[in-house]
């Protein structure tokens, strides 16, 4: 409006001045911003999908770039989720094999079921006919496994077979305290080697107390080969990784160390009942954690100012996934409920995919900052050139052959610059690759898109381009003529935009 009034004052009321003012108004507003922003997000989400990370909520893209803590499950995320029995330690191997088959919901023929139970069946099938054993000893009643009691019971005509965590079954054995303590120590020693230790027991009728010990099953779920490198990359990026698992503390610590995670401080679900929020922040590995306790871990980390990405696969994980800044669900073994509330779904259930998603999230954010810096700096330079150019032409008395005031750029030139040399480079910047994004710490969650350095870039480059263009407009008319000076100014502005795109 000010330039329109200035034009009327100097040039008089004319259609040329109005057209020029309208063109400048169009150029001053970055109308291509919504399209470029949408394209940047869409292409970034598409790149994530190619890397097996499906974004369910676009807000997660921004949050991924700010993640400071990843709270990850162990089984299937850090490990291959392929349980194989390494050894059966039993005083009664025949009955222990029956327990492995009968206290089991998996189906070996179809491969359906929990990976641990499938591993038990694969091992038992070496020594007996699984289907024949199940036909001869039908299930009469059962108590399904639950994270609250940590064991499963199945009653058959032979009696009750139980399998579960050592700490859940050993106290139920008909053994003196000294013998129970020895079994606890033995289970802990095996777990410290990275084995998942499963206890087996037998009881008469439907008894769950006074049981007979059938032995330990040692299973191994090897870490995914790509996880150690992914952990190293994300730690270098300033993101802390903590393990949250339902497994034995010693097993969890062994796996954490094997993949390169910190594992100095280990706490169990029972410890969480007494730990303060400040003490909780120091824990590296959370073991024997119930799903509902994940929510408290997330809230304590967020209370300390952390931006948390939490993984989960069960129905009971939903509150923690919803509360986390980035809820990450498993696409292969996750429940429908967990996938519904999550912000990000891992198609391969792989920890390395979380790191890839964080890398893409940071890259998308940096690209948005780049094209914002570019668009605002170019728009600022155009406004300054036109506004100050009119003043300069009026002061120097620069007029064309028809006696009209020499404008720095014509309306058509302004629109051409705005369409071609503003919009297209901005689109290119939205697709830029940023290979070093994981070499820097996470950005603060509340940091603005145009931060201090970005604003300085906009002001300095905008003023520099405008100053150089005005210099051409001031000195060239005497040497090459008014029209050539105007043309040179236009070409400088057009080519200069492309040059400064590299600096954005």
Please place each PLM-identified region on the residue numbering.
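Hydrophobic alpha-helical segments characteristic of transmembrane helices
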Residues: 1-51, 235, 242-248, 367, ...
């Amino acid at each position: 409006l000010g330039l329109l009034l200035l034009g009327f004052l100097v040039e008089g009321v004319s259609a040329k001045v109005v057209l020029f003012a309208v063109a400048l108004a169009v150029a001053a507003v970055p109308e291509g911003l919504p399209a470029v922003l949408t394209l940047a997000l869409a292409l970034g989400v598409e790149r994530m999908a190619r890397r097996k990370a499906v974004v369910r909520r676009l807000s997660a893209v921004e949050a991924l770039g700010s993640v400071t803590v990843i709270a990850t499950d162990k089984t299937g995320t850090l490990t291959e989720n392929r349980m194989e029995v390494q050894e059966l330690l039993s005083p009664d191997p025949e009955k222990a094999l029956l327990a492995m088959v009968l206290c089991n919901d998996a189906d070996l023929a179809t491969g359906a079921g929990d990976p641990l139970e499938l591993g038990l069946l694969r091992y038992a099938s070496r020594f007996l006919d699984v289907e024949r054993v199940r036909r001869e000893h039908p299930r009469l009643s059962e108590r399904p496994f639950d994270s609250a009691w940590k064991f499963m019971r199945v009653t058959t005509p032979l009696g009750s077979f139980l399998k579960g965590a050592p700490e859940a079954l050993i106290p139920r054995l008909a053994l003196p305290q000294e013998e129970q303590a020895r079994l606890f120590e033995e289970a802990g020693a095996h777990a410290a080697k990275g084995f998942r230790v499963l206890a087996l027991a037998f009881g008469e009728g439907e008894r769950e107390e006074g049981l007979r010990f059938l032995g330990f099953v040692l299973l191994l779920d090897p870490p995914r080969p790509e996880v150690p490198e992914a952990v190293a990359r994300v730690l270098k990026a300033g993101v802390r990784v903590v393990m949250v698992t339902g497994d034995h503390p010693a097993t969890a610590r062994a796996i954490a160390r094997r993949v390169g995670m910190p594992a100095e401080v280990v706490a169990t679900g029972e410890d969480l009942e007494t730990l303060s929020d400040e003490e909780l922040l120091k824990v590296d590995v959370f073991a024997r954690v119930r799903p509902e306790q994940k929510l408290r871990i997330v809230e304590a980390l967020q209370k300390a100012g952390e931006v948390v990405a939490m993984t989960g696969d069960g129905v009971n994980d939903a509150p923690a996934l919803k509360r986390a800044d980035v809820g990450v669900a498993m696409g292969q073994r996750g429940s429908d409920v967990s996938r519904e509330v999550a912000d990000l779904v891992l198609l391969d259930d792989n920890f390395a995919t979380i790191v890839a998603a964080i890398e893409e999230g940071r890259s998308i954010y940096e690209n948005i900052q780049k094209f914002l810096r570019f668009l605002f700096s170019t728009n600022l330079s155009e406004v300054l050139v036109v506004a100050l150019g009119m003043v300069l032409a009026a002061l120097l008395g620069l007029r064309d052959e028809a006696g009209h005031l020499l404008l720095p750029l014509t309306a058509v030139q302004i629109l051409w610059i705005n369409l071609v040399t503003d919009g297209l480079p901005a689109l290119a910047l939205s697709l830029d690759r940023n290979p070093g994004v994981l070499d820097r710490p996470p950005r603060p969650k509340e940091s603005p898109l145009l931060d201090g350095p970005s604003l300085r870039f906009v002001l300095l480059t905008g003023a520099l381009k405008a100053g150089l263009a005005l210099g051409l407009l001031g000195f060239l008319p005497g040497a090459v003529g008014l029209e050539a000076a105007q043309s040179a100014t236009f070409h400088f502005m057009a080519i200069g935009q492309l040059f400064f795109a590299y600096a954005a």
